Amino acid sequence: MAASSGSPQLATEDHLRKGEAVSGLHAVVAGSVSGLVARSVTAPMDTVKIRRQLQLASEHKYHGILHTFRTVAREEGVRALWKGNVPASAMYVLYGSLQFGTYAWLNTAAASAGLPPQAHSLAVGALAGLVSSLLTYPLDLLRTRLVANRSAHFFSLRRQARVIWDTEGPAGFFRGGAWAIAATTLTTGLIFGIYETCTIAADTYGLPWLAAAASPTAGLVSKAAVFPLDTVRRRLQIVDAKHIPFFTRDPGAYSALRGTRFLGLAVHMVRAEGIASLYKGLTMALCKSTPTTVITLWVYQRCLRLLEPTRAPQLPA
């Protein structure tokens, strides 16, 4: 890949760099594959994170990461660590294809806007996150409902969707959607912005270690920055559920909050459980975020190298 005139020769091939011309179809295919691979590897970690996020202060079922893993596997079977994997896998495939497809299109379309490369990546990444999260949110809600189920009985995706439709209506599939989309937009923007900042600095100053650290750094910082929003929206996704007794030992506590909006639920959590409740599951989330981001970006770049062995020249910054 050629560097633009007057800029340092790039040490690494980066399909996410400002102005990089990537086929929309190839971006969609690579994004789908990267999303599916990342989901398959990290699904059990996601289950543990969500269980921790949904546990009320009055409950003492799960104590720490390893205890949660063991408890879920012992009481519900090892397969339970992959509960919700069907909608989650579909979501990751669709999300990955939309995210990287939108990013590839905007990356060239907005290259002439005159933004610095780092700001360009952040803005394009945020818009890509907005589009992908908006169109995949119902799958995210279904995944949360299926993962939250603590019983050994597995609910089918079709049954859960039917229950939501019958008891909550079409709007039930978008419960907490606005804040979730805002959080995902911010997360995606931070991931791409931080990733490109690190890789540009690595190429400019000849720091291979910084290039290697780009993906995990982007994942950790982005996840930590928006985690409280993620925790509140997980609670919001189940608060109106018909099967709430399957999700908690204290269904009355959730039932009392039916109809509560995002900010009201956040305030209630802080008052009833302390500000630390907003960060329940953060350790697991950070442990999951690093491999998820690394796998997603690495597989995406790798797929494009296979799909596009000859690269188009980089547009001027």
Swiss-Prot record:
Topology versus the membrane: Multi-pass membrane protein
Record Pfam families: Mito_carr (PF00153)
Keywords recorded for this protein, A-Z: Membrane, Mitochondrion, Mitochondrion inner membrane, Repeat, Transmembrane, Transmembrane helix, Transport
Leader sequence residues: none
GO cellular component, one term: mitochondrial inner membrane
TM segment ranges: 21-41, 86-106, 122-142, 176-196, 207-227, 281-300
GO biological-process terms attached to the record: mitochondrial thiamine pyrophosphate transmembrane transport; thiamine pyrophosphate transmembrane transport
Ranges occupied by Solcar repeats: 22-109, 116-201, 206-306
Subcellular location: Mitochondrion inner membrane
MF annotations from Gene Ontology: thiamine pyrophosphate transmembrane transporter activity; thiamine transmembrane transporter activity
PANTHER family in the record: SOLUTE CARRIER FAMILY 25 (PTHR24089)
Function of the protein: Mitochondrial transporter that mediates uptake of thiamine pyrophosphate (ThPP) into mitochondria.
Family listed: Belongs to the mitochondrial carrier (TC 2.A.29) family.
Protein name: Mitochondrial thiamine pyrophosphate carrier 1
Organism name: Eremothecium gossypii (strain ATCC 10895 / CBS 109.51 / FGSC 9923 / NRRL Y-1056) (Yeast)
Organismal lineage: Eukaryota, Fungi, Dikarya, Ascomycota, Saccharomycotina
